[in-house]
């Protein structure tokens, strides 16, 4: 995939359309330090940031988290509290039994929610399943807010603003995509309000997202 294609992608990503403003806008949710799995009976704290239109941190919301067993056998709910940073919230919950669980984060800002792909909960004395870069990236695609503007067939989520291209069949130069995810400003937007936010991704998160988008090809990270 050429750099020109990546430039066009960056212009489209997280584009704030006039219709979005007309209907009161939307908010992105970005989960910080997503765990690889849950431990049964042990409290998990999720920290996340809510930003209007993916840009402006939103304080004084009342976000909630719901974790549902993938087999429908149970659910856990938690109310988030304010964190130290602007727009940051913390929610603590405990998964009661082993199995796959889906976590939904409700921002408290209209219908701006995200639902993560199923994540395993394991007993404290059990060996956790191996997490591949691809699967890690698939979860991050939702957790870091990529789903706000992009469709990907491997992630069951509808974009809040359909401004970005469908990434299901896309592949990009891995090294350049890694640089771009680390610093979206290397491709400044050509139009106002069409900004790819910098999510402060770690090298591991960048490598996982590259592996997911490119269907397994991992970029070298330093």
PLM region descriptions:
Residues 42-56, 91:
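Beta-strand-rich structural segments
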Residues 122-142:
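Electrostatic cytochrome c docking/interface patches
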Residues 142-148, 153, 205:
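Short pre-active-site segment immediately N-terminal to redox-active cysteine/selenocysteine motifs
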């Amino acid at each position: 995939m050429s750099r020109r294609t990546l430039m066009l992608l960056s212009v489209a990503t997280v584009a704030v359309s006039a219709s979005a403003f007309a209907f009161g806008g939307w908010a992105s949710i970005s989960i910080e330090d997503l765990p690889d799995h849950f431990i049964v009976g042990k409290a998990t704290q999720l920290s996340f940031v809510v930003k209007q239109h993916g840009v402006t941190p939103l304080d004084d919301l009342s976000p909630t988290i719901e974790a549902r067993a993938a087999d429908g056998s149970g659910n856990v709910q938690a109310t988030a509290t304010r964190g130290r940073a602007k727009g940051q919230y913390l929610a603590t919950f405990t998964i009661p039994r082993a199995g796959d669980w889906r976590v939904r984060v409700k921002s408290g800002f209209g219908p701006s929610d995200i639902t993560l792909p199923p994540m395993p909960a394991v007993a404290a004395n059990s060996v956790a399943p191996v997490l591949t870069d691809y699967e890690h990236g698939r979860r991050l695609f939702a957790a870091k807010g990529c789903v706000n503007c992009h469709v990907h067939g491997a992630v069951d989520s509808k974009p809040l603003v359909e401004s970005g291209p469908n990434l299901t069949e896309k592949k990009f130069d891995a090294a350049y995509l890694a640089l771009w995810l680390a610093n979206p400003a290397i491709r400044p937007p050509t139009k106002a309000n069409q900004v790819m936010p910098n999510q402060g991704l770690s090298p591991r998160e960048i490598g996982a997202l590259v592996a997911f988008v490119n269907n397994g090809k991992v970029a070298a990270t330093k």
